[in-house]
Amino acid sequence: MRLPEKFEDRMKKMLGDEYDDFIKSMDETPIFTGIRINTSKVGAKDAVIKEFGELQNVPWCSDGFYANKSKISGNHPYHLAGLFYFQEPSAMSTVSALNIESDDYVLDLCAAPGGKATQAGAFIGKNGLLVANEIVKNRANILSDNIDRFGLTNAVVTNETPQKLAEKYVHFFDKIIVDAPCSGEGMFRKEPQAVDEWSVEHTVSCGVRQKHILDCAMKMLKGGGYIVYSTCTFAPEENEQVCAYMLENYNVELVEPNNLDMLSKGRGEWSNSKCDMSKTRRIFPHKNNGEGHFVALFHSLDNYESEVNKPKKTSMTDAEKVYRQFEKEFLNTELDGEFCLFGEQLYLKPKCIDVDKIKVVRNGLNLGIYRKNRFEPSYALCLTLKKEDFKNTVDFECDSEELKKYLMGNTVECDKKGWSAVTVNGYPIGWGKASNGILKNHFPKYLRLKR
C-alpha cells in the first residue's frame, strides 16, 4: 500500500521499533469480517454460531465474532431477522468500554450506520432510553432501518446538530457515545480513498471538530455520568490531544475502560501535555485482529441534576384504539407506552423524552400504518416481538425453498387466517396476511432478494 510520506514519518516517530511490523500489517488484506450477535433476541448467539460453525470470539466483546467474508452475507435470513450485525471488530470496543445499565439514558451522538447504537440498545430495558443521532439525513434513515431490524423498542433516532441537541437536553443522559468523525487512518486497509484524502491539515481540523462535539456532549451529560470517546485513526491530534483538552477544560477524569485490558495503552507524550494517558486504549493492526482504533472513557466529577422536563401524557387516540384491536386479535402480548401519530405512521414512543422542535426520524417503535380506521403492522414491530408473542406464525427452516420464496416477495401456502408472523427457525423475520390457504407477502420491498 502506498501511504503518504508525512504519515509514514509520523508513525515511525510514534512506534519506533514497532514501525516495521506496523507497516507490514498495512499491506495485509484482512480476510475476516466482524459480526456481533443480537443478545436481545433470546438464543440468537447459539443459533448464529451453530449456523456458521466455529467462530473466533473478539477478545474485547463477548458477543462479537470474527467470520470468514466468503461464508456470510447480508442476505442471510438470520441477518434479515436481526440476529446479528456486521461490524468492524475494533469498533466493538467503544460500547464494550461502557457498563450500560438497563435503565440508563444513552445518547449515541454520531450514530450512523448503527453499529454502536444497536450494541448499546441491546443492554437497554423498558425503563431506559437510547437516542441515536445522525446529522446527515440519508445516513439517519439507514440508522433507523438498522435499529428497526435489531428490534429495539425504547430507541429514538434524531437528525440534528450536536448544538441543537445540547440546547434541548441539558444534563439529561447517563452515558454518551462519541464515535467522532475522524481522518480515518485506521481504515486505510479497507478504505483506500481515505489515503487519498489524508493530510496533516485534515487531522488537525478533525481534532478541532471533535473538541466541539465533545463540548456539546458535556452539556448533555448528567453529573457523575460517562462519555466514551473513540476514533478510527492513529493521529494523536485526534486522540490523546483531544483527551488532554477534555481534562484541562472540564471536571472529568479518565477511567479504566471495561473489557479492554488486552489493548495497548495511549501515550502521555503524544498528548502535548502533562496528562496521564495510560487509561486510554489503542488498537493497532500489527498487534490485534482489527483496524486502527482509539478509545477513552471519561467520568464526570460534577453532581448537577437534569434540567429537562418530562413530556405530558396524552389521551388515547382513535389510532391507538385500532391498534389495540389488532393487538387483541393477532398478538399474545400488550405493549406498554404512549402512542403518537406522525402522518400515517403510528409510533409507541418512550415516556421519558420530549422531542418537540427536534428533527426526528424514529420516535420510538414504529408500530405500523394507520389509515382510514385500519391498521397495517410494520416490519419493525414484527422484529421487536418473539415467536410466542404472535397468535399466528408460519415457521420455515433457514435453507428452505419456502423461505426463499417469501424473501423474494412471493406468496406461499399457509393454513392460517389473518396477520401472521413468518419466522426462520423460530425467529420473526416479517409479516404475511393469510387468506384462503395463501399467505400474501408483506416482507419489505427494499429488502427482498433478487434471486
What are the language-model segments listed below?
Residues 173, 226-229, 233-348:
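Class I S-adenosyl-L-methionine
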Residues 113-126:
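Conserved SAM-binding loop of SAM-dependent methyltransferases across substrates and taxa
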Residues 124-125, 221-223:
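Helix-to-beta-strand junctions that scaffold the AdoMet/dcAdoMet cofactor pocket
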Residues 138, 175-216, 232-240, 258-261, ...:
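Mobile active-site "lid"/loop adjacent to the S-adenosyl-L-methionine
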Residues 133-171:
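S-adenosyl-L-methionine
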Residues 33-92:
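Conserved AdoMet
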Residues 103-112:
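Conserved class I S-adenosyl-L-methionine
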Residues 1-50, 291-294, 301-451:
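Polybasic, low-complexity RNA-engagement segments
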